[in-house]
Amino acid sequence: MYGIIEDANLTLEGINSSSLLTSGGSEQKTMERYKGETLALSAMIYFDLVRFFGDVPLKLEPSQADLSNAYLHKTDRDVILDTLMVDLKNAVELLPWADEVSGYTTEHATKGYAHALLANIAMTRAGWVIREQAKDGYETANYTDPTYPTQRPDAATRTKLYELALSHLSAIITNGTHKLNPSVENQWYLINQRELDKNYHENIFEMPMGLGVSSELGYTVGVRVNGATTEYGVKGNSSGKMKLTAPFFYSFDKKDLRRDITCAQVQLGAENGVTKESMLGNAPFGIYVGKWDVRKMNEEWR
């Protein structure tokens, strides 16, 4: 993850020192988009680092040849999140909305994503967190560990952060570029087809997979294909190791169309050369994730 941050710092250094950034016209707009994307992606990575590890080194410039700035002490997580929010406010001003510029799809970090990520960080900044040591002026949770206390900011600070998050989420809603697809079935069909949704842009940011790599979607996570069959690709099966539970299934209203798309109570298997569905039966902790369904995937992904 720090490798990505190093690349981002190098990119920002190059952009900020380029005359194209102030040249005017289309070249300046392109450089501004590059800068906005870089700020957003760097913030995304740092946000994950903070959520995973808490206080981590905050590195905002490329490494020097003598490595004099390569080995840094940890920075307080709140300082990091505050820095990211400032960067994202800048990114919001630099980035276009999805499809506002030709070819600028949700596979790029867009203005909508910068708004959404900033709101997410603001809400996280306002929340409870286990700290390495207590901070003055923060609220401490009841029954917290005395060595590593669980704390959150004071009420006034939380209110400001909530208002900040609301303003950025409202900007997304008001603009109207990103909307919920009225058909959840169509939304997941498009995802299985690896087809970008150009009508609703419900997924604010879709990170493309690497060339020749399709991750474990549809294999570890998805409808189970039990036994070898070439009908759905060369490998011919999927493990469906990630499971859902019966309490989750029954948390849906029986008329909720999302239930049977989310929860697959069947598995696929070859019988005399014919692929058939079979019910799982009594499997309260073994319901498959139906959203990724090999039957809906395009040939390139199978």
What positions do the PLM features span?
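Solvent-exposed loop/turn segments at secondary-structure junctions
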Residues: 56, 64-66, 211-212, 266
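TPR/Sel1-like alpha-solenoid repeat signature
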Residues: 39, 115-121
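Conserved, well-structured interaction surfaces
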Residues: 1-53, 68-104, 290-302
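Short coil/turn linking the two alpha-helices of tandem helical-hairpin repeats
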Residues: 50-52, 57, 121-133
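Short, surface-exposed recognition loops and adjoining beta-strand edges that mediate ligand/DNA contacts
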Residues: 59, 96-116, 129-227
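Elongated scaffold/linker segments in the mid-to-C-terminal portions of large proteins
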Residues: 1, 168, 178-302
